[in-house]
């Protein structure tokens, strides 16, 4: 697909593992990415920052990194800043885009200011009175609601709340993961979609139909009964418009090259963006490989394409 001589990449580290709540997912993603790059002839090597200092990348002659870390310091700008310091090119967004992309609260603030539609929401702080805030939030946003930590990925600790009585406990649970909790109005009627972004590839939208209440961690990485619809069933002109809006949602956060933008449609077909992912999962259940496969791009070709974006100025 790319026609790139794999020698151009030099010695490549596949960063995976790490210390976040998404470590196990990252280990799976990283192993597959490593194999995909090696299948294409890339000089790729495993590197787990939880086990080795990042300075070893420079000491051992790595010139490029494929970031398969998920959540925590692998996705919040810290690894990106360190790689910048060591002069190592890497996949995905830089410090700013990574930091904003993992912070759902500040993501939504930017979107509100730049005209990207996002569900109405409230924030709750860890030391707030959960019962009092729950009463206020239900009065303002109604039910059902989604409760999520501001800075976790893979739907870690995301809860759907259908009754006012259940909201205080959901707030308390989410607050164990982050000092800021997002409470978001549930958008009903049109389904959940994702737009995968990989440079100039025109990847199809995917409609996600989980067997359970919503697309949670289990549905993403464990369950085999989640449906991924490609084509997504939308008219071509609407799909093209949503892809453009997804790219805007990605770009206004300072995100670059590679990632995902997730959104809901309401019954009237209006889009509401939930979050971006600047280091998407690359497991057997993950969405970018599915989107690529639908247009004839293999897993190995996809990871080479993503890595090739690090060759750009």
Curated annotation (Swiss-Prot):
<dbReference type="GO" id="GO:0071555">
    <property type="term" value="P:cell wall organization"/>
</dbReference>
<feature type="binding site">
    <location>
        <position position="275"/>
    </location>
    <ligand>
        <name>Mg(2+) 1</name>
    </ligand>
</feature>
<keyword id="KW-0460">Magnesium</keyword>
<feature type="domain" description="ATP-grasp">
    <location>
        <begin position="108"/>
        <end position="308"/>
    </location>
</feature>
<dbReference type="GO" id="GO:0008716">
    <property type="term" value="F:D-alanine-D-alanine ligase activity"/>
</dbReference>
<dbReference type="GO" id="GO:0046872">
    <property type="term" value="F:metal ion binding"/>
</dbReference>
<keyword id="KW-0573">Peptidoglycan synthesis</keyword>
<keyword id="KW-0961">Cell wall biogenesis/degradation</keyword>
<feature type="binding site">
    <location>
        <position position="277"/>
    </location>
    <ligand>
        <name>Mg(2+) 2</name>
    </ligand>
</feature>
<dbReference type="GO" id="GO:0008360">
    <property type="term" value="P:regulation of cell shape"/>
</dbReference>
<dbReference type="GO" id="GO:0005829">
    <property type="term" value="C:cytosol"/>
</dbReference>
<dbReference type="InterPro" id="IPR016185">
    <property type="entry name" value="PreATP-grasp_dom_sf"/>
</dbReference>
<comment type="function">
    <text>Cell wall formation.</text>
</comment>
<comment type="pathway">
    <text>Cell wall biogenesis; peptidoglycan biosynthesis.</text>
</comment>
<feature type="binding site">
    <location>
        <position position="262"/>
    </location>
    <ligand>
        <name>Mg(2+) 1</name>
    </ligand>
</feature>
<feature type="binding site">
    <location>
        <begin position="138"/>
        <end position="193"/>
    </location>
    <ligand>
        <name>ATP</name>
    </ligand>
</feature>
<dbReference type="InterPro" id="IPR013815">
    <property type="entry name" value="ATP_grasp_subdomain_1"/>
</dbReference>
<dbReference type="InterPro" id="IPR011095">
    <property type="entry name" value="Dala_Dala_lig_C"/>
</dbReference>
<dbReference type="GO" id="GO:0009252">
    <property type="term" value="P:peptidoglycan biosynthetic process"/>
</dbReference>
<protein>
    <recommendedName>
        <fullName>D-alanine--D-alanine ligase</fullName>
        <ecNumber>6.3.2.4</ecNumber>
    </recommendedName>
</protein>
<keyword id="KW-0963">Cytoplasm</keyword>
<dbReference type="InterPro" id="IPR005905">
    <property type="entry name" value="D_ala_D_ala"/>
</dbReference>
<dbReference type="InterPro" id="IPR000291">
    <property type="entry name" value="D-Ala_lig_Van_CS"/>
</dbReference>
<dbReference type="GO" id="GO:0005524">
    <property type="term" value="F:ATP binding"/>
</dbReference>
<keyword id="KW-0067">ATP-binding</keyword>
<dbReference type="InterPro" id="IPR011127">
    <property type="entry name" value="Dala_Dala_lig_N"/>
</dbReference>
<feature type="binding site">
    <location>
        <position position="275"/>
    </location>
    <ligand>
        <name>Mg(2+) 2</name>
    </ligand>
</feature>
<dbReference type="Pfam" id="PF01820">
    <property type="entry name" value="Dala_Dala_lig_N"/>
</dbReference>
<keyword id="KW-0133">Cell shape</keyword>
<dbReference type="InterPro" id="IPR011761">
    <property type="entry name" value="ATP-grasp"/>
</dbReference>
<keyword id="KW-0547">Nucleotide-binding</keyword>
<dbReference type="Pfam" id="PF07478">
    <property type="entry name" value="Dala_Dala_lig_C"/>
</dbReference>
<comment type="similarity">
    <text>Belongs to the D-alanine--D-alanine ligase family.</text>
</comment>
<keyword id="KW-0436">Ligase</keyword>
<keyword id="KW-0479">Metal-binding</keyword>
<keyword id="KW-0464">Manganese</keyword>
